[in-house]
């Protein structure tokens, strides 16, 4: 399951949206029970976040509509983040995970920050 259906994602893509991949486990794996399920026992890893971002890229046919939407601003802690993520510094591992799937350095830069910057520049122009 995903937070958005494919039909919803396609509509967002058609409107030029940038969709941020989230790290809150309930949005990453099915069957998550807040306060009961733990990331390690559920097997939640950064790779799952990359799966979701890759899915958006596949639906769009490019990387222009995907970004990192971490939500790591204090709304939750390690009890709901991927088990292989200890600090925000672990976000630096994402480019390697994308590279292993064949993404180019330009595509990775767009996903990591470029798409949101482009989107905001266009919105504010």
Language-model-detected regions and their locations in the chain:
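Short acidic/histidine-rich active-site segments
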Residues: 21-23, 60-85
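Short, well-ordered secondary-structure micro-motifs
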Residues: 1, 31-32, 78-79
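Histidine/acidic residue-rich metal-binding segments in metalloenzymes
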Residues: 1-17, 47-64
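Short, electropositive alpha-helical surface patch
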Residues: 41-58, 80-93, 121-125
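Mid-to-C-terminal alpha-helical segments outside catalytic/metal-binding sites
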Residues: 86-125
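Alpha-helical transmembrane segments and their immediate juxtamembrane cytosolic regions
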Residues: 12, 20-47, 57-59, 73, ...
